[in-house]
UniProtKB/Swiss-Prot annotation:
Pfam families: Galactosyl_T. This is Acetylgalactosaminyl-O-glycosyl-glycoprotein beta-1,3-N-acetylglucosaminyltransferase. Glycans are attached at N73, N77, N196. It comes from Homo sapiens. InterPro entries: Glyco_trans_31 (IPR002659). Belongs to the glycosyltransferase 31 family. The lineage of its organism: Eukaryota, Metazoa, Chordata, Craniata, Vertebrata. The gene is B3GNT6.
């Protein structure tokens, strides 16, 4: 760098030289000042274990390319007795054809690494459920290996409703902070509502095909379930590799709810049948990689349905596959053998795989209790 100094050693020259030396010393101090770990880390030092967040890539894989902008299908208004249907069902019918939405937050390196992913925990959450996600990260959703079998975690989110714009902006900032810090958020540009849970399943299947095609198994669950992760891994280890698996709490002979006030309401216009195909309760179920691929193929030819777990049963039926039951998966809680035992007794949960439903503080307490060296259970502690 040049300084405006003459060559003769006048007073001005000396002053100029002193200014220059001071500037160089200050510059050197800044270069040597300690930086935060995030600043010092080079891209080569990032690992799949750490945050792998990113907004959706500019050029995503073909499986993640969104469809054309979603426009209401006016012909849905011709549905029989359309005006008598609840507004939410009317909207579902108008936008039922929209199946591919933009990915707002991606986790492109979630399944990177040579060892592959043995179990991917895919948790359906809502933007405002920050506390639930944090407790899952600290407890059963820890990204670690069980006996050399890597377990990874993802949260599946839509966007908050437009009713309160200021609240929606704050939640968007919250999700962005989480995604950058943890790299475990997938968020799509559709409203996070009960009727759109099916879209989370479909978009997850597309994401798996693009980003994690070699994952051995998948656990799909709500963000208020408790999972005994070691038990899940132990069960999956015993499964033949590369085979069909779709296991949970079987729902056989389940009938559509015709009461319009119920959130599970399904009118005959959407499902004229008297009973759904056999499916597993959506609170939590397990499936294999091959089954996920078969479901994705079947879903292309299966019209969207507002009850997500029943929709999975429809896709299984179309694929020629059947779900199986597992007594360790309890989406409706545990049935106690006697009134003397508390439903929060950790001995009641030590052999289970998944239980619904838990508050965040209960999740932490149960996790600590089950992993306490002082836990002692006798044979009388069983669930039915």
């Amino acid at each position: 760098m040049a300084f405006p100094c003459r060559r003769s050693l006048t007073a001005k020259t000396l002053a100029c030289l002193l200014v220059g030396v001071s500037f160089l010393a200050l510059q050197q101090w800044f270069l040597q000042a300690p930086r935060s770990p995030r600043e010092e880390r080079s891209p080569q030092e990032e690992t799949p274990e750490g945050p792998t967040d990113a907004p959706a890539a500019d050029e995503p894989p073909s499986e993640l390319v969104p469809g054309p902008p979603c426009v209401a299908n006016a012909s849905a208004n011709a549905t029989a007795d359309f005006e008598q249907l609840p507004a939410r069902i009317q909207d579902f019918l108008r936008y039922r054809h929209c199946r591919h939405f933009p990915l707002l937050w991606d986790a492109p390196a979630k399944c990177a690494g040579g060892r592959g992913v043995f179990l991917l925990l895919a948790v359906k959450s809502a933007p405002e459920h920050y506390e639930r996600r944090e407790l899952i990260r600290r407890t059963w959703g820890q990204e670690r290996s069980y006996g050399g079998r890597p377990v990874r975690r993802l949260f599946l989110l839509g966007t908050p409703g437009p009713e309160d714009e200021a609240r929606a902006e704050r939640l968007a900032e919250l999700v962005a902070l989480e995604a950058r810090e943890h790299g475990d958020v997938l968020q799509w540009a559709f409203a996070d509502t009960f009727l759109n849970l099916t879209l989370k399943h479909l978009h997850l299947l597309d994401w798996l095909a693009a980003r994690c095609p070699h994952a051995r198994f998948l656990l799909s669950g709500d963000d208020d379930v408790f999972v005994h992760t070691a038990n899940v891994v132990r069960f999956l280890q015993a499964q033949p590799p590369g085979r069909h698996l779709f296991s949970g709490q079987l729902m056989e002979g389940s009938v559509p709810i015709r009461d319009s006030w119920s959130k599970y309401f399904v009118p005959p216009q959407l499902f004229p049948g008297s009973a759904y195909p056999v499916y597993c309760s959506g609170g939590g179920f397990l499936l294999s990689g091959p089954t996920a691929r078969a479901l994705r193929a079947a879903a292309r030819h299966t019209p969207l349905f507002p009850i997500d777990d029943a929709y999975m049963g429809m896709c299984l039926e179309r694929a020629g596959l059947a779900p199986s039951g597992h007594e360790g998966i309890r989406p409706f809680g545990v049935q106690l053998p006697g009134a003397q035992q508390s439903s929060f007794d950790p001995c009641m949960y030590r052999e289970l795989l998944l239980v619904h439903r838990f508050a965040p503080y209960e999740m932490l307490l149960m996790w600590k209790a089950l992993h306490s060296p002082a836990l002692s259970c006798d044979r009388g502690h069983r669930v039915s």
